[in-house]
C-alpha cells in the first residue's frame, strides 16, 4: 500500500474550544490529549494547541487538532481567524458559574458570524464542565438542554478533574462530524475516570503552557 493510500484512511479535524476563562477549557483539552489534570490554574493567553489521534468504528484513524482559545480573546481581532475552518466547536462553561453560561451567547454569536462569512457550519457542542461539583451547580440541566434544543447543539456534561465523560465528549463530536454512529458498548468503554488532587485556583494570571505541572496526578481506571 502506498503512503498516499495510507494517508487516505486518516482524517484530521479542527476542534475549537471556546468559553470564559476558568471554565476549564485548558483542563478539558489537557485531560483529553494527555490524560492529565493540572493542579494550578494557568490562564491561556491567545491560544494553545493539543493533538490526539483516536480510532473510530471501521478502524478510521482521526487526529483531533484542539484549539484552546483564551477566555480574554472574546473581544479580540483574531478570534474569527481562530474559529475559521473548524469542523467542530465546543462551547464550554462551568456548571457552578452562572455568568460563564450566560456569556456563551457572545461566543456563539462570533461562531455564527464566521459560519455565515465562510458559508460552512461547524458542529457545535454545549459542554457543561465540573460535574464533580454537582452540589455547587448554578445552571439547571433543563436550562442547558433548552439552549441545545434552541440552537441545534449536541449536549455533554463532563469533569476535566475526574475525567468523567471527557474522552466520550470528543469521541462523540468527532463521530458526529464524520457521520459515524457509536454503539452502546463503545460509549460505555469511553467513559473514563481520572483520579486527581484537589485544585486550589490561583487568581493571578500566569503565562500559558501546554505542559502539565510536574506535581499533577492522573490515573486512568
UniProtKB/Swiss-Prot annotation:
Give the signal peptide range. none
Which co-factor is required?
Mg(2+)
Modification sites for N-acetylserine: 2
Q: Which residues bind GTP?
A: 21, 24-27, 38-39, 41, 44, 71, 129-130, 132, 160-161
What does the entry list under GO cellular component? ciliary basal body; ciliary rootlet; cytoplasm; plasma membrane
A Pfam family cross-referenced in the UniProt record is Ras
Its name, as the record gives it, is Ras-related protein Rab-28
Could you say how this protein's activity is regulated? Answer: Regulated by guanine nucleotide exchange factors (GEFs) which promote the exchange of bound GDP for free GTP. Regulated by GTPase activating proteins (GAPs) which increase the GTP hydrolysis activity. Inhibited by GDP dissociation inhibitors (GDIs).
InterPro entries associated with the record: P-loop_NTPase, Small_GTP-bd, Small_GTPase
User: Propeptide ranges, please?
Assistant: 219-221
| Subunit structure as annotated in this protein's UniProt entry | Interacts (prenylated form) with PDE6D; the interaction promotes RAB28 delivery to the photoreceptor outer segments. Interacts with KCNJ13; the interaction may facilitate cone outer segments phagocytosis. Also participates in nuclear factor kappa-B p65/RELA nuclear transport in endothelial cells.
Region called Switch I, residue ranges: 35-49
GO terms (molecular function) for this protein are: G protein activity; GDP binding; GTP binding
The job of this chain, per UniProt, is described as:
The small GTPases Rab are key regulators of intracellular membrane trafficking, from the formation of transport vesicles to their fusion with membranes. Rabs cycle between an inactive GDP-bound form and an active GTP-bound form that is able to recruit to membranes different sets of downstream effectors directly responsible for vesicle formation, movement, tethering and fusion. RAB28 is required for shedding and phagocytosis of cone cell outer segments (OS) discs in the retina. Also participates in nuclear factor kappa-B p65/RELA nuclear transport in endothelial cells.
Which family is annotated?
Answer: Belongs to the small GTPase superfamily. Rab family.
Amino acid at each position: 500500500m502506498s503512503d498516499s493510500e495510507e494517508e487516505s484512511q486518516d482524517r484530521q479535524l479542527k476542534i475549537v474550544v471556546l468559553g470564559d476563562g476558568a471554565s476549564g477549557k485548558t483542563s478539558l483539552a489537557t485531560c483529553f490529549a494527555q490524560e492529565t489534570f493540572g493542579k494550578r490554574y494557568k490562564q491561556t493567553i491567545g491560544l494553545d494547541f493539543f493533538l490526539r489521534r483516536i480510532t473510530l468504528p471501521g478502524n478510521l484513524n482521526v487526529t483531533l487538532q484542539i484549539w484552546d482559545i483564551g477566555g480574554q480573546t472574546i473581544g479580540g481581532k483574531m478570534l474569527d481567524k481562530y474559529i475559521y475552518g473548524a469542523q467542530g466547536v465546543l462551547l464550554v462553561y462551568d456548571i457552578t458559574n452562572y455568568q460563564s453560561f450566560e456569556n456563551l451567547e457572545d461566543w456563539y454569536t462570533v461562531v455564527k458570524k464566521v459560519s455565515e462569512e465562510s458559508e460552512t457550519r461547524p458542529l457545535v457542542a454545549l459542554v457543561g464542565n465540573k460535574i464533580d461539583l454537582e452540589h455547587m451547580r448554578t445552571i439547571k440541566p433543563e436550562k442547558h438542554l433548552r439552549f441545545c434544543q434552541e440552537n441545534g447543539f449536541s449536549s455533554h456534561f463532563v469533569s476535566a478533574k475526574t475525567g468523567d465523560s471527557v474522552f466520550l465528549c470528543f469521541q462523540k463530536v468527532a463521530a458526529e462530524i464524520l457521520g459515524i454512529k457509536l454503539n452502546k458498548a463503545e460509549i460505555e468503554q469511553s467513559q473514563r475516570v481520572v483520579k486527581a488532587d484537589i485544585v486550589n485556583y490561583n487568581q493571578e494570571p500566569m503565562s500559558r503552557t501546554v505542559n502539565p505541572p510536574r506535581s499533577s496526578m492522573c490515573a486512568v481506571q
